[in-house]
Amino acid sequence: MGFNDMGIRFHKKPFEFHKGWVLVHGDEGSMNTNAGLTALGLARKFGKSVVCGHTHRAGISAFTEGIGASYRTLWGLEAGNVMDKKKASYLKAGSANWQMSVAVIETHGDRVSPMLVPINKDGSFTLYGRLYA
């Protein structure tokens, strides 16, 4: 796919890119039809927050466990896609529950803030208050 040409390292196994956060392809567990819940299922399986692709859906979900001041929150983020759905000839009837978006992960020391950037049908999106069209 030309990853090397783009300076992208492909990891075949889950990759911890920040303490407590794992990047995975998304096919390591059970698929859920609700956006964000495949990633959250993987987060609960791995015991770390997860960012994944593969599902082509855009969603973020969280699960918190613990009691009182002793708790943790796991995040599951599915990054969506940037594909041309018209070229997905394998789709029956050309229909799929897929959303166009990209994920942005901001870190400040140990703090991590995941977010989704929805991409409009015309390919435009807004990030940090600026419209890209």
Task: For each feature predicted by the language model, list its residue ranges.
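Conserved beta-sheet core of the metallophosphoesterase superfamily
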Residues: 20-117
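A short C-terminal boundary segment appended to hydrolase-like catalytic domains
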Residues: 107-133
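Gly/Pro-rich turn-and-neighbor structural signature
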Residues: 13-14
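Catalytic cofactor-binding cores of redox enzymes
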Residues: 17
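Active-site neighborhood of divalent metal-dependent phosphoester bond hydrolases
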Residues: 1-10
